[in-house]
Amino acid sequence: MFKTILVEDNLVFRESLRDSLQLQFPSMKIAEAGDGLEALEKIDSLSPNLIFMDIRLPGQNGLQLTEKIKKLHPEITIIILTSYDIPEYREAAARFKADHFFSKDSMTQQEVNALVKSILTEKGFKRDGSKRHRS
């Protein structure tokens, strides 16, 4: 089963993203975290394939958290989500090894779905989030 964690302190945005992903990818297990500490706990217990990471989080910066996660779990795909689409953040996201960067203000659900489908395929999952069986 494909596992995702949504690390976002804005509850409305997090729930909207969760609902959209669940509708599009019904077999995907989705966990949520409202801050960096909760995210680290969920990573240890869930072993996710994908993380959607906000930059501005209570307690810990999402970029620093991304760097920490990538050092421990380089196989996890991390998508940065931010309302602050400035070159410095894009550069920092790349420097800290984030895999993708989306501006919350300009991203569309179709773009997110297409990217998630691509990640599913790359990691050996079916488009609905279930694991491919080898024959």
What are these regions (language model features)?
Residues 58, 86:
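The feature encodes the CheY-like receiver
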Residues 35, 61-64:
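Acidic catalytic/metal-coordinating carboxylates
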Residues 32-50:
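Acidic, metal-coordinating helix/loop segments flanking the phosphotransfer/catalytic sites
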Residues 8:
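Conserved acidic carboxylate
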Residues 62, 94-100:
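As written
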Residues 11-31:
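Two-component/phosphorelay signaling modules centered on CheY-like receiver
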